[in-house]
Amino acid sequence: MLGGAVWFPYVLLGVGLFFTIYLKFPQIRYFKHACQVVSGKFDKKDTEGDTTHFQALATALSGTVGTGNIGGVALAISIGGPAALFWMWMTAFFGMTTKFVEVTLSHKYREKTEDGTMSGGPMYYMDKRLNMKWLAILFAVATVISSFGTGSLPQINNIAQGMEATFGFAPMATGAVLSILLALVILGGIKRIAAITSRVVPLMAAIYIIGALAVIFYNAENIGPSFSAVFMDAFSGSAAAGGFLGASFAYAFNRGVNRGLFSNEAGQGSAPIAHASAKADEPVSEGIVSILEPFIDTIIICTLTGLVILSSGVWNEKFQTHFERSAMSIIKGDYTEENQTQREDLYKYLNGQKSNIETFTGNIEVVNGEALSTGFTVLHSRSIAEDVRFGITEKHKYTGVVEVIDGMPTDDSISLVGKSLVHSAELTTKAFKRGYFGDSGQYIVSIGLLLFAFSTAIAWSYYGDRAMIYLLGHRSVMPYRVFYVAAFFWASFADTTLVWKLAAVAIVVMTLPNLIGIMLLRKEMKESVDDYWVKFKKDNEK
């Protein structure tokens, strides 16, 4: 998969590092000014645009603060260990500069549409400034695909599953209610979207932050060791701990950067579409506002999630769970965590290094869910699974022969359950139960997941309809919005795996052209920044 390619994180960080040095660390030098601009201190009357600086920031944040902040951080830590959090920070730090550049250029080349609203984004500077219409079309098509694959379908799918697991609500019922609410919001256009997100984003952030702090302070004695693990393992990889079998530097780096990108979308070119709607005479001023976005999304919210998971100790603890085929492998031989030689071999195997481990191929005799055969070990979520049982359903235990080829049962209807490490939102939920709120902490995750995911769907609908305007004109917007809502409802009870995989490729197809574009316009960007400060100082001397 392109998004998981070894070179992709290096390209992403490399561009951010280049602009950080080239523009002399704007994420540090302009941070205070960004807070002043977003507060409205320098606003002028009759400035062209659809939203205020704060509303544009809130809309962009509603697109970035999503399931990645809850499940994505947990997934990164479960795969890459504590070190993955460090590389998420690096992605955010350099991403603040990348975001500054892409937003400034997108705002600079925005256009007014037939209905009087603004439309901007990387496709406009690719077309109008670089004269690369084919690249602009490619970016816009990828944006439309991503609006479904990352912004809509997996969001409602996660919401529906979470509501069913926590409250017992039927997925279709959840989908129906939220689809109606989604339609009421997005059919009103950017002004209604901005009005809603500017209220929802602060509320959902406050709820989640309070819940996270309740866990972190409850486990205050583990805060120091958690930070120590993050920094000590950053350049060496995460050592084995508890049920966690360890992760190499490459795994920690790759997962941290990828999850960081998925969370704050720096370099992807999506958030600039929202910022292009802002009322601003100077594109650079809106670019400066966008510096706050990765900071809030990743440095604050993702860090809180990471500390909740690490300080509570659940990240390397085994729980009873259903095994996902994508995170499972059956290997030849009987392995235990107590055997140091076997642990070292498992570390190599799980990190793609040369090892003596072979995947299991053969038949496993099962009676009443329990395996009678020996000579194999089940791995799940980078841990040795314990108390493994085979079944057709949760209540129906399997009896018969399970055929396994290359480490995987050939019959998809046979499920495996047992004790292993867990990941994604399930891991975050376990962690939130280890605080002052006890088991009630799971409701904070469910409510957070609901608000985060729903707001992401709202923001991405706007990104998609601006891309449709560029591709097919204003008349395509309403059919797109109707189809977006219909697909949103369908995904509440359907399998969206294929769309998710397609979107993972689409994200890269968005990101690479955008990174190429901003690199080609680096000199123009520097000149724009210099001109902005000359004019700003002159205006404020009056």
Curated annotation (Swiss-Prot):
Mode of membrane association: Multi-pass membrane protein
GO CC, alphabetical: plasma membrane
Transmembrane stretches, start-end: 1-21, 57-79, 83-105, 134-154, 167-187, 200-220, 227-247, 295-315, 444-464, 477-497, 498-518
Keywords: Amino-acid transport, Cell membrane, Ion transport, Membrane, Sodium, Sodium transport, Symport, Transmembrane, Transmembrane helix, Transport
Keyword Chloroplast among UniProt keywords: no
InterPro entries, per the entry: Na/Ala_symport
Predominant cellular place of this UniProt entry's protein: membrane
The name this protein goes by in its record: Na(+)-linked D-alanine glycine permease
